[in-house]
């Protein structure tokens, strides 16, 4: 899989851009603030319908413009697809596939598959659980695009249920009882969607575990006992060879929701479910978040991305690799090892502030990015 063309209209700093791309290594070099990361962000948006830098879409639209457009031509084997996304702040975004409208933007998910390496990746190790949950969920959708609907349904139910809890809590504090007649219904939805999401995450962690350990050794250049464990907010149900895992987890979530209801009403929050889960990362038995050195943390963050890359390749979904200013964060040894590991990919896009940050192992087409223009280097 690779991109052959990227077109932008009023996306971030670009009034307009048409960029022809090819397989292999593509390097984008330019000083900070010239628009390199905006290109990576646009490509990632086509793959995930989200930015890795901001949570809302409004900042993606160039100041003064009413909307932004991102077009990408994707080649996979002997097939090509043209994806167009229109980003409209305050309104529903629109999508086209091969110039024909599709009912929902998420219908184009899966056409482009990417793995992004970025300076923000250090937060996968050192940051809050939300970043690690997002890492798992984005990979779930990349492998199984229908999981986007499960995530959307879970988020919708979570918001509705939490609103009901806040309303009930306010009523009780005012001396009333609060209307909880529909809470049982929302509990059922939350447990059902939550169990599907949780079991999918558990299966993903098991699939990733061997790759993370191997990638860590390859990047760090040293062996270490790397731990990779999913921590659910719900006690693990007892093993049952007859009942499916999803059914047992759904029952466990329901039971915890019942037990937590008084606290949830008091706090106005849903305290049970996969939105409260975490991924515990350890190095030599110690939590990486608190004990890993800077180098160990970077090796582990890169290992998560490399393991994702290999897992998608094993699924016959060769991803486009996006490396956004990541080499500047690494020492010389890790730069060289990472370059050797990603070089065989079908397409690799690398950004760097200076040419010296790009390892010699990554040779290919080079562009210079300056003041919103992207010019091929001679």
Swiss-Prot record:
Molecular function (Gene Ontology), one example: ATP binding
Matches recorded under Gene3D superfamilies: P-loop containing nucleotide triphosphate hydrolases (3.40.50.300), RecF/RecN/SMC, N-terminal domain (1.20.1050.90)
Keyword ATP-binding: yes
Subcellular location: Cytoplasm
Keyword field contains Nucleotide-binding: yes
Binding site for ATP: 30-37
Pfam families attached to this UniProt entry: SMC_N
GO biological process, one term: DNA synthesis involved in DNA repair
Keywords assigned: ATP-binding, Cytoplasm, DNA damage, DNA repair, DNA replication, DNA-binding, Nucleotide-binding, SOS response
InterPro entries in the record: DNA-binding_RecF, DNA-binding_RecF_CS, P-loop_NTPase, RecF/RecN/SMC_N, RecF_2
Xref: SUPFAM superfamilies: P-loop containing nucleoside triphosphate hydrolases
Main location (coarse class): cytoplasm
GO cellular component: cytoplasm
Role noted for this protein: The RecF protein is involved in DNA metabolism; it is required for DNA replication and normal SOS inducibility. RecF binds preferentially to single-stranded, linear DNA. It also seems to bind ATP.
HAMAP family cross-referenced by the UniProt entry: RecF (MF_00365)
Homology family: Belongs to the RecF family.
Protein name: DNA replication and repair protein RecF
Species whose genome carries this gene: Frankia alni (strain DSM 45986 / CECT 9034 / ACN14a)
């Amino acid at each position: 899989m690779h991109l052959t063309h990227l077109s932008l209209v009023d996306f971030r700093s670009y009034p307009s851009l048409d960029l022809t791309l090819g397989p292999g290594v593509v390097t984008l070099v330019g000083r900070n603030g010239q628009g390199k990361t905006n290109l990576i962000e646009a490509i990632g948006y086509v793959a995930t319908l989200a930015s890795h830098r901001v949570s809302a879409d409004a900042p993606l639209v160039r100041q003064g413009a009413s909307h932004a457009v991102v077009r990408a031509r994707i080649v996979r084997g002997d097939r090509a697809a043209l994806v167009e996304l229109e980003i409209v702040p305050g309104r529903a975004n629109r999508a086209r596939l091969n110039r024909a409208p599709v009912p929902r933007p998420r219908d184009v998910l899966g056409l482009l598959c990417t793995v992004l390496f970025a300076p923000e990746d250090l937060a996968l190790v050192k940051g809050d659980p939300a970043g690690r949950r997002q890492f798992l969920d984005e990979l779930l959708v990349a492998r199984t695009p229908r999981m986007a609907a499960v995530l959307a349904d879970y988020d919708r139910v979570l918001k509705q249920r939490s609103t009901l809890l806040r309303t009930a809590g306010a009523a009780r504090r005012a001396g009333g009882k609060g209307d909880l007649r529909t809470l049982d219904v929302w509990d059922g939805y939350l447990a059902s969607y939550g169990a599907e999401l949780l079991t999918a995450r558990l299966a993903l962690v098991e699939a990733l575990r061997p790759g993370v350990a191997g990638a860590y050794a390859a990047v760090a250049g040293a062996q270490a006992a790397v731990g990779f464990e999913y921590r659910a907010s719900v006690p693990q149900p007892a093993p049952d060879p007859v009942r499916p895992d999803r059914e047992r987890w759904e029952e466990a979530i329901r039971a915890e929701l019942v037990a937590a209801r008084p606290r949830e009403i008091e706090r106005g929050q849903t305290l049970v479910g996969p939105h409260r889960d975490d991924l515990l990362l350890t190095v030599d038995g110690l939590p990486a978040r608190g004990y890993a050195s800077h180098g160990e943390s970077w090796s582990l963050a890169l290992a998560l991305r490399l393991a994702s890359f290999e897992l998608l390749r094993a699924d016959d979904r060769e991803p486009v690799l996006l490396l956004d200013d990541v080499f500047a964060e690494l020492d010389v040894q890790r730069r060289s090892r990472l370059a050797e590991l990603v070089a065989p990919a079908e397409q690799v896009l690398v950004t760097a502030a200076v040419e010296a940050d790009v390892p010699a192992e990554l040779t290919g087409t080079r562009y210079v990015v300056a003041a919103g223009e992207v010019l091929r280097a001679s």
